[in-house]
Amino acid sequence: MHKIIIIMLFFLVSITWGTTWIAMKIAVETIPPFFATGIRFLAASPLLIILSYLTKKPLLFPYGQRRFQIFISIFYFSIPFTLMLYGGSYVNSSISSIIFANMPVLVLIISHFYLKKKINFIQKVGMVIALITLFFVLLIDLKSECFFQWKGILALLLALLSHAVIYVECQKKSCNVSVITFNALPSLISGIFLSIISWFIESPNINFFSTRSILAVFYLGNFCGICGILSYFYLQKRVSSFYASIVFLIFPLIAGFLEIYIYKKTILLYELWFIIPSGLGILLTLIPINFFKNIIRFSK
């Protein structure tokens, strides 16, 4: 039964993260990014607050960390998720997902410089492979599109950096609040904040919103935003972070194939070839220090 639960959680996380990028692209077809992100969080927050009540999880962070909760609302939710939708309107889903698949690599680099975390030789090799692969993927993609989508790529890289920094800062502050507490109130704050900003700078016209864009926003909020996040954190509790993070290797493939199916796009050959070294590099950065020692000990 335990193995079945793990497989189901792994499958659910892979599907939700893989479909997130195509849903973002559909959402911004007719809805401005600020407004789409705001409604996404406003749709998710009531369910998260209800879950908080049912599970008796506090909405507020512990004393001494409540300013950090506001900081998270802005720099983990409001800004990066808006940048992700904005970037997704320029960049295809497969490239967007490849960029975010490098999250473990960036977290490791920031942890090394900010928390003085040790990096073993295998992880260093993985970092080099992953970063070089990402560089060439972005360079080739930019050249193929005549550098049209550079704003989108920059937005996605900034969103990636913001998420990685907050993740490392949570480690530094020993922020061990439940996943529901982490998401519930910041989602509500971000939803209100972004919706207000949108009315001033985007002037959204609901009459122009397509049905599929509206459905995509609610899918992002109620399914990806709740099921995906909760499933990933529960998966981390049942298996090591190394095995849980293998999801980062799977969801770019799902995003790529969905884009082919929905938008009838042909996947470029270089994208297929670069998946192998990119996945290898990310996998090597996730390997814990004692992994090979345990293998050698077991073989003896």
From Swiss-Prot:
The chain crosses the membrane at residues 4-24, 31-51, 68-88, 95-115, 120-140, 146-166, 177-197, 214-234, 242-262, 272-292. It is a multi-pass membrane protein. It is found in: Cell membrane. Keywords: Cell membrane, Membrane, Repeat, Transmembrane, Transmembrane helix, Transport. InterPro entries: AA-Vitamin_Transporters, EamA_dom. Belongs to the EamA transporter family. This is Uncharacterized transporter BUsg_270. The lineage of its organism: Bacteria, Pseudomonadati, Pseudomonadota, Gammaproteobacteria, Enterobacterales.
